[in-house]
Amino acid sequence: MDGLTCSLTYEGGELVSAETRGNGLVGENILHNVKVLPSIPKKIPYLKKLTIDGEIICTYKDFENFSEIYSTPRNFASGSIRLLDSKECSKRKLTFVAWDVITPFYDDYQEIDFLSEKLRNLRNMSFTVVPFIRATMKEVSHVESFISDIQWMAEECSYPIDGAVFKFNDCAYGRSLGETEHHFKNALAYKFYDDVFLTSLLDIEWTMGRTGALTPVAVFTPVNIDGTEVNRASL
């Protein structure tokens, strides 16, 4: 999905927190606006702590009325959910689409540790969940064969989807694979379209991550990508 990533937290069945992804550790508080979105349940029949990751998006139809002001549905959703005026935000018909559960998730006394089951349980609680397909794939070629089907699904969808993520359904196995400096090893991201932009390289800087690993960052003349000015990128 192409929108703004955020996390919702429920405690005792009540929505208590909503934050953007931010820098990965600390996000921006958007609870005042999330509470006015009809697509987000304010109460759920689940009393344990529950943190849900998802995306704030705008459908193509709802974006039509604002296309002269905002360049893309993504920029529209990102700007609207940050408004100080919740009444204005409520008029913009944003939608939250859930795609993962971060905290342990239980069905009665047994932990749910399969992603497909987590998403089905969220759907039963009236959340909108990301479209997904369960498949058995033993080779990379099997992944590639699914891409055209997923692209077709994206084209038929009512909101922007710019790629797909392949994840292990067994969450415990996925966690056992660990992570790199940039991403978890249990997932493979695929972008549908490769946009090419002409720019000039100005410099290469080095940044140090939390584990001490150095990452080169390209600094280049600004280019406009989906309405956003970009002048840096990790190599």
Predicted regions and their residues:
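RNA/tRNA-interacting regions in translation and RNA-turnover enzymes
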Residues: 1-235
